[in-house]
Amino acid sequence: MQSFRKIWNKPRPDDWMPLARFYYADSALNDIASELDSFDGRRDPDRCNALVTRLRVAQDRVLHIITEMLIHLYPREQDRACRDFRVKFPDEILHDTLPGQLWFGAECLSAGSNIIDHETESDLIRPLAKDVTKQLDFLRDLLKNQSLRDPSAYNPVIKENLLKFDKLFAEFEYQYVSAMVPVKSVKEHDSQLDVAVLFSEVLSLALVKDLITQDLIDYCDPSVMIAIPRLGIVWGLLVYSNGALNVDVPAENLSEMFRPFYSLLVKIRNLLRILTPTELTKLETVLCKGESAVPEDTSSTLTMSDFRTNATDEEKAKNNQRVWMCDMPSDSTSSLDSSVQDSSSETTSLASSALASPHSGSEENVSQIENEEGDDEAIGTNSNSSNEVTESPETIEEPDNVDMEESSESEVDTHIDETRNESDDEITDDVQASDVLQVETKKCKSSRLLEQKKFDKSVKTIIPMQTDPRSQIDPKNLRSRFRSSEDLVHRLFVCIAGVADQLQTNYSSEIRKVLKLILQPSEIIPVYEVVNAQVANSQTEGEETGVEAQETLPLPAFMGVRWVPDEDCEQCTACSMPFNFVRRRHHCRNCGRIFCHKCSCNTISIPEHGYDRKVRVCNLCYVHRLNSFGCNEPMSQVNENGATVPSVTEQQSAQTASASS
């Protein structure tokens, strides 16, 4: 009986209904599976790999058609299985071939295979995989039998099994993907949404301040993608301080993207608070432009290039470097020394790589930004214990040490001369910097410790024991660390741009997802509100409530064109040649009218009507669809009564012809 149905009731290959397309997709899948089982894959691995690829493509096509049936039968998302968990998945997981990969994985797990390096997870989800494959095989048999009976109807058994399979497949998708890749937790997802809200507010504020134009957003200019994270750091620390960049809370409460830069963000926030409105505007401008136009004065700064090229001014530069380092706190000096020697520290690696700037003195920029609060942190540390200064061996005043340090000046000069005379290919910049800075640090430490011992005694009576050092920052003291206003703006630009660039590099998928949320928002479906809180009575009034109006909105679906019945047309619509045994009727898939073979010999794909592959269309529709400067509507359509109604283009042409006559 099944064979006779296949012969007489087999759907047409060009039928756009989902059940008809499922029949041919399922038949192709069975053919590939039979061919794959008919030979030994170890003898011909290339052919086996090619067949496996074709099998996964065929499985993916079958699942897409089943999904289309579910959408057609249950248009509302709440009637189908919930898949909101997909927002926790990485972007590289969500693609069109995911259903086919899940089916293939379920087949492998059902056969006894394990996920590589995930044997425990494989044993846990194996029963669910068997249920999915069993339900899918049963559903395929039901759909294939129904496609041979009536491709346009769905009985209650099919509807029930479609929903059952949808729920099983959604549950298997979550467990399988969770076993394969790390999935975000609820807290991490909420933190990512907070960052999206911050960037959205930043984009709106940037439009108000004319830092970003609407044209740049419409054209998706790369400068917008670069400027939004940079401005987000500035305004997230100043304007929206209680949002995603609230550094007053522990680092664990921040987003995963900003957590590695917690200490650096605190220091950037403190520097941003001492900026004047003019300086803040200048900083925002240079962050949007992508480059700092602030000239840097290096007359009092010793850089690495001075050791290599400035032989005549070596002594002067060396003395300036000593004076500058003696003025710095001991914590800052030690941190600067360790930042040159040990590049594995978090903020130092950021300074040496992402915060690198073509401007001279960039090494000093990062070191001073990293240690801008050296005095305050040292104060807070020393105030926690009254005996710390006296007990520490480094803080004991030793005149012999001072004399010894003073007597070593000649050794320092000799060491610098030897370092300068060595070739660049034998001694690197890092070695030169570490040698010089170690000696200079020893010379300045004794004088610094003498001042610190006297200063700690007075600080203990001013700052309480449990006071946070960050709350005692003096704006004047911070500003005095920089040579000028331009120097402060430039150093902030280097650090903020470096953090933003690190976000773009290390968290590219998260940044891309956040930018997609704010630059390509989801379409908002309008909901009609009830006026004056009056609920309509469906029996007496024709007015609908807001929920009813929302449910009756038109839903996107593939709708076919109504065809002209064969008995209503005895001749070709284009050439008016009568149909006979030789000249057969052909329907145009675009307009639904009947033509002969000569007038409908063209084929083209019509995705909006459900035809993904090429189908037959008449010559007129073919020309109109290929003409990019013309309209794509059919020349005429068929109304509900079966009568041919001319299109707008034909009506305008007829009116023009009648007016000219």
Swiss-Prot record:
First and last residues of each zinc finger (FYVE-type): 566-626
What PROSITE patterns does the record tag this protein with? ZF_FYVE
Which GO biological process entries does UniProt record here?
Answer: negative regulation of epidermal growth factor receptor signaling pathway
Residues given in the record as Zn(2+) 1 binding sites: C572, C575, C596, C599
Write the record's keywords in alphabetical order, separated by commas: Metal-binding, Zinc, Zinc-finger
Q: What GO CC terms are in its UniProt record?
A: early endosome membrane
Instruction: List, alphabetically, the InterPro entries matched.
Output: FYVE_LST2, LST-2, Znf_FYVE, Znf_FYVE-rel, Znf_FYVE_PHD, Znf_RING/FYVE/PHD
User: Which residue windows does the record flag with biased composition (Polar residues)?
Assistant: 297-310, 641-650
Q: Report the family membership.
A: Belongs to the lst-2 family.
Q: What is this protein called?
A: Lateral signaling target protein 2
